[in-house]
């Protein structure tokens, strides 16, 4: 994931900062506890495509 892209994208729910999870290829919003998929290098920033973070992921 290009770090320049991470500087300009935001969570579509709260407009907060997103963090890239390399292991799962997801952009994570720690405020809303949601993970958005990255498919073929393209972030899918749709609320209905996001998955809720597990309890373990929230505290990582």
From Swiss-Prot:
Disulfide bonds: none annotated. Gene3D superfamilies: 2.20.25.10. InterPro entries: Trm112-like (IPR005651). GO terms for cellular component: cytosol. HAMAP family: UPF0434 (MF_01187). PANTHER family: PROTEIN PREY, MITOCHONDRIAL, ZGC:162634. Belongs to the UPF0434 family. This is UPF0434 protein YPO1399/y2773.1/YP_1194.
